[in-house]
Amino acid sequence: MIDRYINNKINAIWNDQNRFDTWKLIQEKYVETLEELKIAEAGIAKKIRKAEVSKEEVYKQEKVTNHDLASFVDILQKKVGEGSNWVHYGLTSSDIVDSANSLLIIQSIEIAQELILDLLKELKLKAIKNKDTKIIGRTHGVYAEETFLGNIFGNWYLEIKRSLDRVERAKVSIAYGKLSGPVGNHTVVTEEMEKITLEKLGLKPEIFASQIAVSYTHLRAHETVG
């Protein structure tokens, strides 16, 4: 994208470093759940939280593994040290990547919502200010009858407001993740472990999943906001 059209806040959300930090957050909350359920020994989640994994480290390791998530996990485990076997325990790459993408998309949508709200405020002000400003109305591209400029802004306001409602529904529809393992059947990670972890992240578990989460929800969000 051309630089001048980039929203800096949204761009920062999708920066690789923030993406890796989000992966780490999911790993932390997952291990925290394992600790609460007395599956993993206490203190590992805290070590994950304190560990810093830079994007440069992931890039370097990826030249060896040819896999970004595997590279990230390798580095995180080394930094955690004792107890690192619980990092990514029973999970598959898409458990982390798909769940993280849901979080990142939600954050992006929230930025878009802020911008839309600003636009609505401006349209409302212009509708009120120009409620008595007369203009020539058109039908079929030709002059028709006299109307008011405020009415034009009011119509735009309603259309944008309806779009904002659709964006909110898209945000709700995408608030799902998966932590159900390589084929989505909870062989190692139980439904309880998945549910507790995702709740900490503000997500719900997918009812059905395979290796990946259902992609339709992500597609719908992109379609609505785009």
Q: What residues fall within each predicted segment?
A:
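A structural signal for small-residue-enriched, beta-sheet-centric alpha/beta enzyme cores
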Residues: 207-209
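Cationic, amphipathic, low-complexity alpha-helical segments enriched
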Residues: 213-214
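Single conserved hydrophobic/aromatic residue that forms the stacking wall/gate
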Residues: 218-226
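A helix-coil-helix interface module used to build multimeric assemblies
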Residues: 1-186, 190-198, 205
